[in-house]
């Protein structure tokens, strides 16, 4: 029986959505057109004959929504794709307990909710789903505004002003000149007295030797 027909029959059975047995990551992803996407589904139970289905729901979950079969990974038969699936754009592989759905060159029409599923007896167990949004342009993130740093003011000591004009006042100059004159007069008086004393001594010596 074809997987698509089998799924239509299995959909009439009890369905368990969002079970913790299958953990899907990420919960939401937005990518740009023609990029690659990897969706992960980790099984928390050990099955002897592991078989993981990947389904897509193009519209929001409702009573009228249906699941589109994409591909399955069977431990015995390998990978089986759906009838209307572009096989060159989709691949599924196993990494330990994780099952990876790899989508390449995605388009906006590939947007939807992707579910992984395992078949029990009689119920179907779904993961919580990964919502994929494919857009032509990703929103640009605003650059964080830089905080304006206040510059610290450096307190500078005032420079001593250079004094223009004469360094000394007229009074000071007058005192200096008067001091110089007094010194000159004193020196002259001292020299005069010294000369007189010398002459007096010479006279005394002459009178003594006569």
Curated annotation (Swiss-Prot):
Ranges in the topological domain labelled Cytoplasmic: 192-210
Extracellular-facing ranges: 19-170
Gene3D superfamilies annotated for this entry?
Immunoglobulins
Q: Which residues form the signal peptide?
A: 1-18
- Where does the chain cross the membrane? 171-191
An annotated GO BP: regulation of immune response
Kindly give the membrane topology term recorded for this protein: Single-pass type I membrane protein
Q: Which domain of life is it from?
A: Eukaryota
Sugar attachment sites: 102
Which UniProt key words apply to this protein? Answer: Adaptive immunity, Cell membrane, Disulfide bond, Glycoprotein, Immunity, Immunoglobulin domain, Membrane, Signal, Transmembrane, Transmembrane helix
For molecular function, the Gene Ontology terms on record are:
coreceptor activity; MHC class I protein binding
| Location relative to the cell | Cell membrane
Disulphide connectivity of cysteines: 41-116
Every copy of the Ig-like V-type domain together lies at 19-132
Q: InterPro entries this protein is in?
A: CD8B, Ig-like_dom, Ig-like_dom_sf, Ig-like_fold, Ig_sub, Ig_V-set
One cellular-component annotation, GO: cell surface
Q: How does it assemble?
A: In general heterodimer of an alpha and a beta chain linked by two disulfide bonds.
What does the function comment of this entry state? Identifies cytotoxic/suppressor T-cells that interact with MHC class I bearing targets. CD8 is thought to play a role in the process of T-cell mediated killing.
What name has this protein been given in UniProt?
Answer: T-cell surface glycoprotein CD8 beta-2 chain
